[in-house]
Regions:
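One-carbon transfer enzymes
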Residues: 1-253
Length: 253
């Protein structure tokens, strides 16, 4: 495979697990990065969940620190700002990737000749939006990851499909295990997607099919529904093995 064209990365300008681990994965995969755009912190006023699925109080190096050490160009700027648009138009990138971002504007997406890759922690289109691990449990959906070329406007978690992969749930899993396994799969699939379409002689975005169904976009799980999560998780975990025992999901699992 030929070397990928230099990549533009959308990241957060504060310590963030996916940003940190994603930059290291891309670097170790030998994928050149033309620019990392770190968005400043914004307070979102989202209700704090009563049931946590992610580890707490972990420390990560910031994107700026990683880029300084690896010699990667870095700028701190809001992703949808006029300054970012101007920088991207001058750079004329082929492919971008999201390692930390809010919703990107259509004007930003249009700066890329192929598109912007996102790794979503749920199976699209049936599990769009937020709290994907929890919604999958509550609705009886498979856990999984989807890589896609994002669409603009109101089509959040849609666009063009690159790959979908079901993530297994093991008999002794906790919610934290499932969450971390999904995050690990996101990074593996993100690098694979960049390698597949990042080559300047490789596939164009138009070659990837749009999603046939829009599915449903869901916000955070409401408290009155979330209170059923732990009880349903035990049933969900036991049922996953029964449903998939005849379908091998990979020797590592």
């Amino acid at each position: 495979m030929a070397s990928p064209a230099p990549l533009v990365v959308f990241a957060y300008d504060f310590p963030h697990k996916k940003t940190y681990e994603g930059l290291l994965r891309l670097h170790l995969a030998g994928i050149p990065i033309a620019l990392v755009i770190g968005a400043p912190f914004v307070q979102l006023h989202i209700r704090e969940s009563a049931i946590r699925v992610a580890p707490a109080k972990l420390q990560f190096l910031s994107a700026r620190h990683v880029c300084d050490r690896l010699g990667i160009p870095y700028v701190r700027e809001a992703h949808n700002s006029p300054e970012t648009v101007a920088a991207l138009r001058e750079l004329a990138p082929r492919v971008g990737v999201v390692l930390g971002a809010r919703i990107l504007s259509q004007e930003i997406i249009d700066c890329f000749s192929v598109g912007v890759i996102n790794a979503h922690p749920g199976l699209i289109p049936e599990n769009r939006g937020l709290d994907n691990v929890k919604w999958a449990i509550l609705l009886g959906l498979d856990q999984g990851v989807t890589t896609h070329l994002i669409a603009g406007g109101k089509d959040v978690d849609l666009g063009r499909l690159i790959e979908r992969q079901v993530v297994p749930v093991l008999p002794d899993d906790t919610l934290l295990d499932v969450h971390l396994r999904i995050q690990n799969t996101e990074l593996e699939m993100m690098v694979r997607a960049v390698e597949e379409i990042g080559d300047a002689r490789g596939k164009c975005g138009i070659e990837f099919p749009p999603f046939r169904d829009r599915g449903t976009y869901r916000a955070c799980v409401p408290p009155e529904i979330e209170e059923r999560l732990l009880e349903q998780f035990r049933e969900y975990r036991d049922g996953w093995r029964s449903k998939n025992q005849r379908e091998p999901v990979g020797e590592d699992w």
